[in-house]
Amino acid sequence: MKQYNAIKGKYPGALLLFRVGDFYETFSEDAIKASKVLGITLTKRGNGTASETALAGFPHHSLDTYLPRLVRSGLRVAICDQLEDPKSVKGIVKRGVTELVTPGVSFNDHVLDVSKNNYLAAIHFQKDSLGISFLDISTGEFLTAQGDRHYIDKLLQSFSPSEVLFCKQKKEVFIEYFGDRYNTYALEDWIFAYDFTYDLLIRHFQTTSLKGFGIEEMLEGITSAGAILHYLNETEHKEVAHITRVNRIEEERYVWLDRFTIRNLELVNAQQLEGVPLIEILDHTKTPMGARLLKKWLILPLKELTPIQERLDTVELLVKNKELTTTLVDELKPIGDLERLISKVAARRVNPREMVQLKRSLERLVPIQQLLKQQDQHVLLKLAEQINPCEYLAGRILNMLKEDAPMLTNQGRIIRDGCNAELDELRAIAYTGKDYLLQIQQREIERTGISSLKISYNKVFGYYLEVTNTHKEKVPADWIRKQTLTGAERYITEELKIYEEKILGAEDKINVIEQKMFQDLVLEAESYINPILQNARIVAQIDCLCSFAHAAVANNYCKPIVEDSALINIKAGRHPVIEKQLPLGESYIPNDIYLDDETQQVMIITGPNMAGKSALLRQTALIVLMAQAGSFVPATHATIGTVDKVFTRVGASDNLSKGESTFMVEMNETASILNNLSGRSLVLMDEIGRGTSTYDGISIAWAIVEHLHNHPNFRPKTLFATHYHELNQLTEDLKRVKNFNVSVKEAGNKVIFMRTLKPGGSEHSFGIHVAQMAGMPTSLVLRANEIMGHLEKEHVREGHEDKLKEVPKSTLQMSLFEAADPAWDSIKKILTQTDVNIMSPVEALLKLNELKQLIK
């Protein structure tokens, strides 16, 4: 335990997996944690003594099963292995931590999700600005940015890091700014010193400055990036040659989506368990790199026209040329995770089977490059020029490694025959030598007349001849007895002993030679890190463009016209997610949206609850963002003037942990929108003010619309859904405000939602009808109708609570024969709608009982 305690002391914040023979053991508090997370048995060592210690473990070959569960629970796991062969040493085996796996730092395929990046983030806090960096060590992607707390919060929401680093002294500030929803780890203050982190970066990239990366002036960003490199060293990840550059997240290139918008629009994650995010509709990628890039394209839509148009034009070509798209997709399917494969090469963690997969992936680049070169389209031609098939490396792997190479280097049969003369000779001894043993066995059978004689092997005695007691009198004098059993004797011969040494020695030498040759091949592959990472980026782009083309064809999307204007003109727009969830045979009802900054800047949309106002708002934002991501859109026509910011205030959510009500959260989000407006903003507001009293809500909503319309500097395009019909009056004074309603049709006492957007305001919310549809008791619905009728009759304007007090108590207890009795009117309605010709006797009795209840 002395050795264990010494190693544990170096990693106090991690759960230590301590290799003991064929098991990984945990002790004390670590054992208790492991037992709970993994569901393994907790035992005790030294039970009842002063040195009693909790103990829990699992077989070493089960590491890939248990490690992911530990890491996903938020634990940092230090893996302590035996650094020497126990057979070759006397006393305690030398041990050491070979890897510290954390939620944000792992190469383990069972911890990682192939379709998602696994980001480690670091934040550096300064008074007026924060720096943030993201690293996915499994792919080598390294990003940095800096800005105010709101921008950093947006990036955290967009990139969803698995682990966040910050200075110990800033823990409370971090929680205040970003909450407690992230796995975090606090580092010492000195690690965030600018000079220290700058030096780490230039030493890693072997440069004299960071100007070539465009981050030289980003002091906070540099500090956060350097802190990440320090953390890699601290977690025993020293082989990181695949981290070849650090990229600046260029805020000016991408549409601003605050964290509320990313959440509300469900771009990559659904809010509800059964929900479907947009990415599930658009993701038809065939490679892991493509799946990861597509997510970035959706959370970082472009603002610049040229790259948007290049994507759209390429998607159009792929839509029209189905043969090209089909062929490209077929070539993409066999390609493995080039980013993570070459990252494992750099980290010296790649296995033989993965090297074969790398070779197969590189081989697919040749036909892809040839296909692209045949196209008369500059984007595809440019991509073709950037592909480097690394044919020499692919050939080296092909000629050296067996196609069915095993996972582990010590399993043998990695290297092809003919690559090494000594290896071939040893294999002849090791593998054909066993045939020679059978020849010895047959010769001795014939020599002795012992028909049951056989040659066997065990680790204690090696190869031996076994003779049953029945025939032991026939044993020749030159045989040497090694073991006596109950019913048999075991012998060896000089010839058998010599050949055994040759066979066993050959197998050991084979492993040594194969491992050395494989390690040399891996070192050779390291020189291809940059071109293979470049290939991965090209393949990912091709994959995403093919994915957009597939979605466009499958879902009947149109190519949007994206231009430098203030216009948004969508004809027959549809919600890309909802239309795919409708029952078979039911079609999505499309709607038109027109916004500009001269005639129709603000659309006030009224209509009943459940009519589809919220879906219309979200659908508009999704169409705009899809267009600026380079995708076709669900509409018959769409002209999109580029937006630079998209704001949404939809849905209700409390933040009770911070003592904030639904209304307070709503006001915070609305204030954030109004304080960050621009002339190219798209603003979506749904039911603002519903969390407070009616007149407070109307007043706030009214003032917000006025503010958006009369802003001295900007005219943000706005969709404003509300159930406050009083807002329809705004069009009288605000010329760029227009009223629309989502229409309904009344049939008796039922409401049919038409889900069609029409000009003009609506005067009814039909809330009571919705309550009836939800299954509210009939008596309650009748009472609600009575109260509403009274309020409408009295024309409630002021003293709302006083008027409510004046509403008479339920008149259901009055005389059944009172002519003005509302209950009697309700009974007449029920009887009118009842078809006695199709009622069963039981149904009739139930209906009679319902009527009886109304007059009690």
UniProtKB/Swiss-Prot annotation:
Q: Does the keyword rRNA-binding apply?
A: no
Give the record's keywords alphabetically. ATP-binding, DNA damage, DNA repair, DNA-binding, Nucleotide-binding
Coiled-coil segments: none
Q: Which SMART domains does the UniProt entry name for this protein? A: MUTSac, MUTSd
InterPro entries noted in UniProt: DNA_mismatch_repair_MutS (IPR005748), DNA_mismatch_repair_MutS-lik_N (IPR007695), DNA_mismatch_repair_MutS/MSH (IPR017261), DNA_mismatch_repair_MutS_C (IPR000432), DNA_mismatch_repair_MutS_clamp (IPR007861), DNA_mismatch_repair_MutS_core (IPR007696), DNA_mismatch_repair_MutS_N (IPR016151), DNA_mismatch_repair_MutS_sf (IPR036187)
| SUPFAM superfamilies cross-referenced by the UniProt entry | DNA repair protein MutS, domain I, DNA repair protein MutS, domain II, DNA repair protein MutS, domain III, P-loop containing nucleoside triphosphate hydrolases
Q: Which Gene3D superfamilies match?
A: 1.10.1420.10, DNA repair protein MutS, domain I, MutS, connector domain, P-loop containing nucleotide triphosphate hydrolases
From the UniProt record, give one GO term of the biological process aspect. Answer: mismatch repair
> What PROSITE patterns does the annotation carry?
DNA_MISMATCH_REPAIR_2
Annotated residues that bind ATP are located at: 607-614
Query: What does the record give under GO molecular function?
Result: ATP binding; ATP-dependent DNA damage sensor activity; damaged DNA binding; mismatched DNA binding
Alphabetical GO CC annotations of the entry are: cytosol
Q: Does the keyword Cell membrane apply?
A: no
Q: What does this protein do?
A: This protein is involved in the repair of mismatches in DNA. It is possible that it carries out the mismatch recognition step. This protein has a weak ATPase activity.
NCBIfam families per the record? mutS1, PRK05399.1
Q: Which protein family is it in? A: Belongs to the DNA mismatch repair MutS family.
Q: What is this protein called?
A: DNA mismatch repair protein MutS
Identify the gene encoding this protein: mutS
